[in-house]
Design a protein with these regions (language model features):
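Catalytic cores of carbohydrate-active enzymes across secretory and cytosolic contexts
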Residues: 1-240
Length: 240
Protein backbone atom coordinates (compact mmCIF):
# COMPACT_ATOMS: atom_id res chain seq x y z
CA UNK A 1 0.00 0.00 0.00
CA UNK A 2 2.47 2.65 1.13
CA UNK A 3 1.62 6.26 1.99
CA UNK A 4 -0.28 6.78 -1.27
CA UNK A 5 -2.23 3.57 -0.77
CA UNK A 6 -3.52 4.72 2.60
CA UNK A 7 -4.47 8.09 1.12
CA UNK A 8 -6.34 6.33 -1.70
CA UNK A 9 -8.25 4.10 0.73
CA UNK A 10 -9.17 7.13 2.81
CA UNK A 11 -10.43 8.92 -0.30
CA UNK A 12 -12.56 5.90 -1.14
CA UNK A 13 -13.93 5.73 2.39
CA UNK A 14 -12.41 2.31 2.99
CA UNK A 15 -11.42 1.43 6.56
CA UNK A 16 -9.89 -1.90 7.55
CA UNK A 17 -9.13 -3.57 10.86
CA UNK A 18 -5.81 -5.08 9.73
CA UNK A 19 -3.14 -3.63 7.45
CA UNK A 20 -0.65 -5.99 5.82
CA UNK A 21 2.86 -4.86 4.92
CA UNK A 22 3.75 -7.39 2.25
CA UNK A 23 7.55 -6.85 2.25
CA UNK A 24 9.33 -3.87 3.73
CA UNK A 25 8.69 -1.43 0.90
CA UNK A 26 5.03 -1.30 1.95
CA UNK A 27 5.88 -0.34 5.53
CA UNK A 28 5.58 3.41 4.95
CA UNK A 29 1.82 2.91 5.11
CA UNK A 30 2.34 2.98 8.87
CA UNK A 31 3.81 6.49 8.62
CA UNK A 32 0.55 7.74 7.16
CA UNK A 33 -1.52 5.73 9.61
CA UNK A 34 0.36 7.28 12.52
CA UNK A 35 -0.19 10.76 11.09
CA UNK A 36 -3.91 10.10 10.63
CA UNK A 37 -4.28 9.00 14.25
CA UNK A 38 -2.37 12.05 15.48
CA UNK A 39 -4.75 14.27 13.52
CA UNK A 40 -7.60 12.63 15.43
CA UNK A 41 -6.11 13.93 18.66
CA UNK A 42 -4.24 10.86 19.91
CA UNK A 43 -0.78 11.06 21.43
CA UNK A 44 2.12 9.52 19.54
CA UNK A 45 2.28 6.55 21.92
CA UNK A 46 -1.46 5.95 21.60
CA UNK A 47 -1.23 6.13 17.82
CA UNK A 48 1.72 3.75 17.76
CA UNK A 49 -0.16 1.24 19.92
CA UNK A 50 -3.12 1.26 17.53
CA UNK A 51 -0.90 0.95 14.46
CA UNK A 52 1.09 -1.91 15.94
CA UNK A 53 -1.90 -3.93 17.10
CA UNK A 54 -3.48 -3.73 13.65
CA UNK A 55 -0.31 -4.24 11.61
CA UNK A 56 1.09 -7.41 10.04
CA UNK A 57 4.47 -7.62 8.30
CA UNK A 58 5.41 -10.50 6.00
CA UNK A 59 9.01 -10.87 4.89
CA UNK A 60 9.97 -13.09 1.96
CA UNK A 61 13.68 -12.51 1.45
CA UNK A 62 16.22 -14.42 3.59
CA UNK A 63 19.28 -12.45 2.42
CA UNK A 64 20.37 -8.94 3.49
CA UNK A 65 20.40 -7.67 -0.12
CA UNK A 66 16.64 -8.09 -0.26
CA UNK A 67 15.99 -5.60 2.54
CA UNK A 68 16.02 -1.95 1.48
CA UNK A 69 18.15 0.52 3.42
CA UNK A 70 18.45 4.24 2.71
CA UNK A 71 21.30 6.67 3.34
CA UNK A 72 20.26 9.34 5.81
CA UNK A 73 20.82 12.21 3.37
CA UNK A 74 18.62 10.69 0.69
CA UNK A 75 16.00 9.62 3.19
CA UNK A 76 15.83 13.04 4.84
CA UNK A 77 15.37 14.74 1.48
CA UNK A 78 12.06 12.92 0.99
CA UNK A 79 10.88 12.15 4.52
CA UNK A 80 11.79 15.15 6.69
CA UNK A 81 8.29 16.63 6.48
CA UNK A 82 6.78 13.35 7.67
CA UNK A 83 8.96 13.44 10.77
CA UNK A 84 7.62 16.93 11.45
CA UNK A 85 4.03 15.75 11.00
CA UNK A 86 4.70 12.97 13.51
CA UNK A 87 6.08 15.48 16.00
CA UNK A 88 9.40 13.62 16.12
CA UNK A 89 12.94 14.88 15.92
CA UNK A 90 14.75 13.69 12.83
CA UNK A 91 16.98 11.45 14.95
CA UNK A 92 13.99 9.79 16.62
CA UNK A 93 12.41 9.17 13.24
CA UNK A 94 15.63 7.62 11.90
CA UNK A 95 15.87 5.43 15.00
CA UNK A 96 12.57 3.79 14.08
CA UNK A 97 14.42 2.20 11.17
CA UNK A 98 17.66 1.34 12.96
CA UNK A 99 18.54 -1.96 14.60
CA UNK A 100 20.57 -0.02 17.15
CA UNK A 101 18.81 3.27 17.97
CA UNK A 102 21.33 6.07 18.29
CA UNK A 103 23.88 4.51 15.94
CA UNK A 104 24.28 7.46 13.58
CA UNK A 105 26.24 5.35 11.09
CA UNK A 106 23.29 3.04 10.51
CA UNK A 107 21.02 3.53 7.50
CA UNK A 108 17.23 3.55 7.66
CA UNK A 109 15.92 0.02 7.11
CA UNK A 110 12.33 -0.39 5.97
CA UNK A 111 12.40 -3.91 7.39
CA UNK A 112 13.34 -2.65 10.85
CA UNK A 113 10.68 0.04 10.57
CA UNK A 114 8.10 -2.62 9.67
CA UNK A 115 9.12 -4.77 12.64
CA UNK A 116 8.87 -1.77 14.97
CA UNK A 117 5.42 -0.76 13.75
CA UNK A 118 3.75 -4.17 13.33
CA UNK A 119 2.73 -6.48 16.15
CA UNK A 120 2.87 -9.59 13.95
CA UNK A 121 5.90 -10.51 11.83
CA UNK A 122 6.17 -13.69 9.80
CA UNK A 123 8.28 -15.52 7.26
CA UNK A 124 6.81 -17.74 4.58
CA UNK A 125 7.90 -21.19 5.77
CA UNK A 126 9.01 -22.84 9.01
CA UNK A 127 12.67 -22.63 7.99
CA UNK A 128 12.35 -19.08 6.73
CA UNK A 129 10.76 -18.11 10.03
CA UNK A 130 13.81 -19.46 11.87
CA UNK A 131 16.18 -17.67 9.48
CA UNK A 132 14.25 -14.41 9.93
CA UNK A 133 14.41 -14.70 13.71
CA UNK A 134 18.19 -14.82 13.43
CA UNK A 135 18.35 -12.03 10.84
CA UNK A 136 16.23 -9.67 12.95
CA UNK A 137 17.68 -10.58 16.37
CA UNK A 138 19.41 -7.21 16.85
CA UNK A 139 16.09 -5.37 16.73
CA UNK A 140 15.07 -6.84 20.09
CA UNK A 141 18.15 -6.49 22.26
CA UNK A 142 18.28 -8.75 25.31
CA UNK A 143 16.24 -11.56 23.77
CA UNK A 144 17.30 -14.79 22.12
CA UNK A 145 16.22 -15.06 18.45
CA UNK A 146 13.67 -17.76 19.25
CA UNK A 147 12.09 -15.48 21.87
CA UNK A 148 11.12 -12.86 19.30
CA UNK A 149 7.62 -12.63 17.92
CA UNK A 150 8.76 -13.52 14.39
CA UNK A 151 6.63 -16.46 13.28
CA UNK A 152 5.81 -18.09 9.97
CA UNK A 153 3.11 -19.18 7.60
CA UNK A 154 3.53 -21.85 4.96
CA UNK A 155 3.07 -20.47 1.47
CA UNK A 156 0.98 -22.67 -0.77
CA UNK A 157 -0.70 -22.64 -4.15
CA UNK A 158 -4.21 -23.33 -5.41
CA UNK A 159 -3.59 -26.58 -7.23
CA UNK A 160 -6.43 -26.42 -9.82
CA UNK A 161 -5.22 -23.04 -11.12
CA UNK A 162 -1.49 -23.62 -10.56
CA UNK A 163 -0.98 -27.02 -12.18
CA UNK A 164 -1.39 -27.22 -15.95
CA UNK A 165 -4.00 -29.68 -17.22
CA UNK A 166 -1.37 -32.14 -18.51
CA UNK A 167 0.08 -32.57 -15.02
CA UNK A 168 -3.36 -32.76 -13.48
CA UNK A 169 -4.26 -35.64 -15.80
CA UNK A 170 -1.04 -37.46 -14.89
CA UNK A 171 -1.71 -36.96 -11.17
CA UNK A 172 -5.33 -38.10 -11.46
CA UNK A 173 -4.25 -41.21 -13.32
CA UNK A 174 -1.51 -42.20 -10.88
CA UNK A 175 -2.58 -40.72 -7.53
CA UNK A 176 -6.26 -41.60 -7.52
CA UNK A 177 -9.45 -39.66 -6.89
CA UNK A 178 -8.57 -38.82 -3.28
CA UNK A 179 -5.60 -36.66 -4.30
CA UNK A 180 -7.64 -33.58 -5.25
CA UNK A 181 -9.16 -33.40 -1.77
CA UNK A 182 -6.08 -34.33 0.24
CA UNK A 183 -3.07 -32.73 -1.41
CA UNK A 184 -1.10 -32.45 1.84
CA UNK A 185 -1.08 -36.24 2.29
CA UNK A 186 2.56 -37.24 1.80
CA UNK A 187 1.60 -40.88 1.35
CA UNK A 188 -0.25 -39.96 -1.83
CA UNK A 189 2.72 -38.01 -3.16
CA UNK A 190 4.91 -41.07 -2.63
CA UNK A 191 3.08 -42.63 -5.57
CA UNK A 192 5.09 -40.39 -7.89
CA UNK A 193 7.92 -42.92 -7.61
CA UNK A 194 5.69 -45.49 -9.30
CA UNK A 195 5.21 -43.32 -12.36
CA UNK A 196 7.40 -44.30 -15.31
CA UNK A 197 10.22 -41.87 -16.03
CA UNK A 198 9.20 -41.89 -19.69
CA UNK A 199 5.69 -40.67 -18.83
CA UNK A 200 7.04 -37.75 -16.83
CA UNK A 201 9.60 -36.90 -19.49
CA UNK A 202 7.07 -37.00 -22.32
CA UNK A 203 4.81 -34.65 -20.37
CA UNK A 204 7.69 -32.22 -19.84
CA UNK A 205 8.61 -32.34 -23.53
CA UNK A 206 5.04 -31.69 -24.62
CA UNK A 207 4.74 -28.72 -22.28
CA UNK A 208 8.08 -27.31 -23.40
CA UNK A 209 7.00 -27.50 -27.04
CA UNK A 210 3.76 -25.76 -26.10
CA UNK A 211 5.70 -23.01 -24.31
CA UNK A 212 8.03 -22.47 -27.29
CA UNK A 213 5.07 -22.14 -29.65
CA UNK A 214 3.57 -19.56 -27.29
CA UNK A 215 6.82 -17.57 -27.12
CA UNK A 216 7.12 -17.54 -30.91
CA UNK A 217 3.53 -16.36 -31.30
CA UNK A 218 3.92 -13.55 -28.73
CA UNK A 219 7.25 -12.47 -30.20
CA UNK A 220 5.78 -12.33 -33.70
CA UNK A 221 2.78 -10.39 -32.42
CA UNK A 222 5.09 -7.89 -30.71
CA UNK A 223 7.19 -7.51 -33.87
CA UNK A 224 4.14 -6.79 -36.02
CA UNK A 225 2.82 -4.26 -33.53
CA UNK A 226 6.14 -2.41 -33.20
CA UNK A 227 7.27 -2.84 -36.83
CA UNK A 228 10.57 -4.41 -35.87
CA UNK A 229 13.43 -5.43 -38.13
CA UNK A 230 12.23 -8.49 -40.13
CA UNK A 231 15.66 -10.11 -40.45
CA UNK A 232 16.31 -9.69 -36.74
CA UNK A 233 12.89 -11.14 -35.95
CA UNK A 234 13.42 -14.20 -38.13
CA UNK A 235 16.88 -14.73 -36.67
CA UNK A 236 15.44 -14.77 -33.14
CA UNK A 237 12.54 -17.05 -34.09
CA UNK A 238 14.84 -19.52 -35.84
CA UNK A 239 17.10 -19.59 -32.81
CA UNK A 240 14.36 -20.51 -30.36
Amino acid sequence: LGIGGIAALKKLGVEKEIYHCNEGHAAFLNVQRLIDYLRQGLSFNEAMELVRVSGLFTTHTPVPAGHDKFDEGLFQHYMNDYANQLGLSWTDFMNMGREVPGDLTEKFSVTVFACNTCQEVNGVSWLHGKVSQDMFKNIWQGYFPEESHVGYVTNGVHYPTWAVSEWQKLHDKNFGEEFRGDQSNTNIWEKIYNVADEEIWETRKALKAKMIDYIKAKYTESWLKNQGNPSRTMSVLNGI
